[in-house]
């Protein structure tokens, strides 16, 4: 399924700015804290995908025992070569969250995140709720950059 979504992405990149920005940043596909382990509470996976109709989503999965967390990606704008700003809607509630992803070597992580009312969830890569670094995700089964 992911291969089909990735195959459709180049055609969609010219039609919609969101799929194009995700592809340019090298984000489309499956990422995990540890790709060698199955998704679970200690090894979350993030999946960036574009449907054939051009709808972009971000799905966090922690295994069968947990419900996936799905976001519709509404906007994707490059901040610089290493950062991409996303506006996402948590589904099905449609709660808006703004976030900035940051590339660090061969990984990507949430660098900042906030709600429209200004509530900060992640600041400079640190989760405000627990003071821990946001997890670093590595690409599963492929190169980091769309240009590689």
Segments the model singles out, each with a brief description of its role:
Residues 32-36, 57-62, 83-91, 111-112:
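Short beta-strand segments that buttress and anchor functional surface loops
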Residues 88-94, 103-105:
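Intrinsically disordered, low-complexity terminal tails and linkers in eukaryotic proteins, enriched
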């Amino acid at each position: 399924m992911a291969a089909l979504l990735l195959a459709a992405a180049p055609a969609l990149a010219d039609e919609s700015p969101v799929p194009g920005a995700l592809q340019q940043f090298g984000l489309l596909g499956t990422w995990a804290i540890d790709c060698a382990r199955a998704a679970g509470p200690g090894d979350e996976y993030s999946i960036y995908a574009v449907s054939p109709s051009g709808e972009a989503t971000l799905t966090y999965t922690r295994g069968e025992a947990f419900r996936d967390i799905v976001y519709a990606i509404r906007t994707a704008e490059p901040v610089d070569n290493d950062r991409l700003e996303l506006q996402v809607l948590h589904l099905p509630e449609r709660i808006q969250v703004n976030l900035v992803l940051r590339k660090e070597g061969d990984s990507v992580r949430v660098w900042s995140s906030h709600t429209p009312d200004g509530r900060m969830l992640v600041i400079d890569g640190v989760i405000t709720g627990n003071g821990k670094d946001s997890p670093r995700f590595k690409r599963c089964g492929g190169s980091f950059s769309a240009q590689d």
